[in-house]
Amino acid sequence: MATTAGPEVGSDTALKERVLSTPEVLAQSVANMAPSAAMALLPLFVFFSAGNALWLSFGLGLVVMLLVGYCAAQFGKRINSAGSFYVWVTRGLGPGAGHAAGWGLVLGYLFTGIACVLGFEIYGDQFLVGLGLSPGNHAVRAILYVVGGLTPALVSVLDIRISQRAAFILEAISVTIILVLCIAVFVHNGGVFDHAQLTLKGFKPGGLVVGMVLAIFAFVGFESAGALGQEAKDPERSVPRAILWSCAAVGVFYLVVSYAQLDGFGAAGFAKASAPLPQLADHVGLGPLSHFIAIGITFSMFACALACLNAGSRMLLSFAHDGLAPKALAH
């Protein structure tokens, strides 16, 4: 039987109870993972360690995170709370471990959100330069910082359903653009078979382990659907499903995109790439698509910043109810 976490999710808060559908809860985890942004550079870093075992690194990372997700899903079935891992770990391991987990997540959401605002400016500026704007325009960069920092906060405050739908739409657009590029790579190469990758040419176990650890970073945030336990219509089902489905679906996306990048460039070309996705579009003869990739990654950064605000604010709400944060945050 599911339970609430206790006083930290009382009805006197501003949270709307039982309003989010399963897709809207799922959008939280997917947006927080920022799959399009993750694929912008992370596969290159994994490649430097794992080589042609790049796709296998992401595959093993997926397996590990599915196991972690299964454990989180069991808590999500039983405890509906805005505090997610803070409450779950407290129930399982005690207050000390719970506080450490909670504050760790809050700091993670904070720094990830800041990184997303920076990424929003970088890729937004890249998109505008591609349209003909002069590079290094400080006024435009300042506007992008303001838009990337304030707009997610405004959307987050307005309504959780609007917030989740916006995150879902933006991430869906960016993922679709990158999948179009992957299809173009396979068509350009005459198929999906890459002998070097599928035979793990030059494979080294040590490099694979390091690559797997790096790949796991791409899954950070998939647990954040747990923070919507109070607001989900059917939290006992939607929260566990969102955690597991987001991990599985985005993990498959990572496998496809990382494989396609190395397939498109080849090992030598990939090692020299500085901006793999836009350069890959040029490589397969779809130069104009690079502009759409830039705006897609910009959307992904925005959606991730929004998801960090949603999850982090609910974590602080739980802290406030437990006396770990100012009481003003409890309403």
Predicted regions and their residues:
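Membrane-interface "cap" regions at the ends of multi-pass membrane proteins
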Residues: 1-43, 47-53, 65-70, 195-196
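Select transmembrane alpha-helical segments in multipass membrane proteins
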Residues: 19-29, 94-107, 145-148, 202-215, ...
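Extracellular loop-to-transmembrane helix junctions
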Residues: 35-135, 140, 144, 246-249, ...
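Membrane-water interface regions at transmembrane-helix termini and the short interhelical loops
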Residues: 16, 75-78, 100, 147-173, ...
